[in-house]
């Protein structure tokens, strides 16, 4: 029983039904978000019971979230729009692989769960080709199921990889010592990923009669929940620009991959005590920052400096921050647990590149970050939606940033979404021992993105962040005492 695949298809009344998507769903990055939950298996759990548990988990989850059984397809119109459709030959897919078996153990070369834990679950051991399969990116006309899960058994752990997909994108594989969830933005955003995984975790616990943690997921009309500002124009969106001919949609990087070498994903950690100290230092010259504001300002300064950006070539640096806009919406209000996308626009802070070495940087940068986050309100979302509905294509505009080779950064702010507090049940170690995320196809591609994770088990309120750059940049960060005063490198 080395490999088993099960497809959970929609019931006949659902076949042919369509979920219409809204403008923010259409503009959301068409790339994969893969989340990794590292869970430790109980010593006496059997392979048969794991298979039964994860099969039941998916079966129950798709009853609560039917859109997990949809397929992402093109609407075949001139606007390059997507939709979610219930098809009779597709659905949510679960694959179980036992990498402890004689036939498959040679394909898993990274040892036990303890070995991964000792290395802090490094990205270079999270190989997608090992942990999820079934999509050929060259098959352009093949529809992609919304949810695919692969449960990978390794010594001492289960690598459960779940992914929500989108059409015409490369298929993402993940590696982790326990569980990986993967979400594509067309299906839902980061909070939607959490809602999906919370539902899976609830059914994985297998004690629903004692469960009181149900989340009231709201399946509102995605196509109409945002009222577009039809009077908005592109000049009202300085953080967006038209896509140039031949340019890839929402890909703010320009480089020849053959010229790059030594690319790495590094994990850094800042303790709860150091976060407090950092806030104290910044508060001496300005309003006391939140932990997120302080950490974002710190990362922004030291990463840009480590990249040796030439101020004469790039006089300004931008920092984009992801924002969940649900609570900021009005007319109509958007429910806290709305299923869909409220991930655009990003908050964008700006600073002169020459200012990154000034003594006043932290006070100025913190103010810029705070102001940028506050500016992502209902009006900002409605302006973006209004421009999108007027454009000839949903893919006609892109972020007005240059993350490579330019100086701009994006921080994906997941630290306030309680992924690491999800309880998978005692057989799966309760809460995960680590949480990892990949967004898009990051292998061999520096893209100026940082991911800030929620606190790990045993870390208190300390936070891990992932940075992906070439080795020379990371080496300069590691040699920067102003950075290592706060952050330690884990992998």
Enumerate the predicted regions with their spans.
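Amphipathic alpha-helical protein-protein interaction segments
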Residues: 47-51, 176, 186, 193, ...
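Acyl/amide activation-and-transfer machinery of modular secondary-metabolite enzymes
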Residues: 28-41, 81-108, 258-265, 325-368, ...
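Flexible, P/S/T/G-rich "lid" or insertion loops adjacent to the active sites of thioester-utilizing
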Residues: 230-287
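Hydrophobic, mid-to-C-terminal alpha-helical segments
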Residues: 286-351
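Non-catalytic N-terminal regions of enzymes
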Residues: 1-234, 276, 280, 291-311, ...
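Helical lid/core segments from catalytic subdomains that handle acyl or acyl-like groups
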Residues: 263, 340-424
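Short Gly/Pro-enriched turn/cap motifs at secondary-structure boundaries
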Residues: 136-139, 257-259, 399-401
